[in-house]
Amino acid sequence: MFVQILGSAAGGGFPQWNCNCVNCAGFRDGSLRAQARTQSSIAISDDGVNWVLCNASPDIRAQLQGFAPMQPGRALRDTGISAIILMDSQIDHTTGLLSLREGCPHQVWCTDMVHEDLSTGFPLFTMLTHWNGGLAWNRIELDASFTIPACPNLRFTPLPLRSAAPPYSPHRFDPHPGDNIGLIVEDLRTGGKLFYAPGLGKVDAPLLEIMAGSDCLLVDGTMWDDDEMQRRGVGTRTGREMGHLAQNGPGGMLDVLEQLPEQRKVLIHINNTNPILDEDSPERAELVRRNVEVAYDGMSIEL
């Protein structure tokens, strides 16, 4: 299984276009040693030719341009994208579909709840109908694994996660299973397993057991501290309120990952305020000490 990190930042990317927090300002003036990052999206393949896009970020055009296999050049109009999985209906993970309209129809896998949000509050399925058939919906059942014809050697298992529906959702304050999912992706030939959850608000005992059965954990790295937005002076909401488990503090992501010594551990969906973006920060050094990696655009993983 081939996993390509197309984008590794949270919403807004890094540096965020309108932000002058210490990270964004430091990156621009050269005082901060860090890498620019686009908004979170990955691609998965069983052969390196046909790819399943997991979430369609607003930065999708630049991401595809930066990864040569996404334009195999086999025909006058072509793409390496064979299917799309949407793990939630957040703007940061779905608006890239608008930039992919020239390639419609696209086969899209998502849950009932995500499909409802994207047919009502943010009606992408309706909007794109006029583009050569638009988006063909394939339902993700929460209690069953599924395969995708273009990558038959991969088995996808959805994991309902506790998180918040987007503000435009009809059930914004009434969470439902399927608002947000993680994925277990298993290569049926090698047995390699990827656990992917860029939006992870809570890890309970059953989920921890599932993570322990995976080879690589690609997990929510949004914030270092739960009150990071307040500390940086750029917001009032906590990470938990937004459905993200912070790395630091009792019961935080680092405590969770400490219980999984055998797995490869990679943080993704990193907010522009997170001090781990600073490669010289104490927080980044703590990750190195704990053998936890920070995803970057262009990172490749093979399982």
Curated annotation (Swiss-Prot):
Q: Which domain of life is it from?
A: Bacteria
SUPFAM superfamilies, sorted: Metallo-hydrolase/oxidoreductase
What GO biological process terms does the UniProt entry carry, in alphabetical order? pyrroloquinoline quinone biosynthetic process
Q: What is this protein called?
A: Coenzyme PQQ synthesis protein B
Q: Is DNA-binding there in the keyword field?
A: no
Return the similarity comment.
Belongs to the PqqB family.
- Kindly state which keywords UniProt assigns to this record, in alphabetical order: PQQ biosynthesis, Transport
